[in-house]
Amino acid sequence: MIPKNIYVFWHQDRLPLVTYKLFLNIKQKHPDFKVTKFTDKDVLKIKNKPEFFNTVLFKDKTRVSDWLRMYLLHHYGGVWIDINCLFLNKSLNDIIDFSLPKVQGFHLFGNIFENWVIASPPKNKLMELWFHETEKCLHRKYSYCIENGHYYDSSHPLVNQLPH
């Protein structure tokens, strides 16, 4: 079962006006969810971050967000939403089956599974693998991409575990 927790990230406490309104939209469309906004300060409080996090990774907010989404979904489960998403008519209740104990999201083009909205139960095996691969990639950056470039042209083993 996927917990009804929504996680978003913005590096600062204060949100720009447009981002603030989008954040309010997420909260208004999901009154039955616990919505948590993480900031840089919150991320720094997380224990057991990789050694390279504070020296290399923390300077790049996109990578902080990438790491945080995988960390939260793997350890606690719930739903990650990029804070700039706008819900017009539907809510997550209309697009995600919270009783299904699998990773869910959007699989749009070829073998690409989008990560701007991901739902997962806690301790899911796919999220565990994805989290560890994300840490390897963030730590080694360019060398990781070069060594694993062949996956861009073929089916990655993680794709086979998606419910879609």
Where does each model-flagged region fall?
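Small-residue hinge/turn detector
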Residues: 66-78
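Glycosyltransferase-associated regions of secretory-pathway enzymes
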Residues: 1-66, 81-164
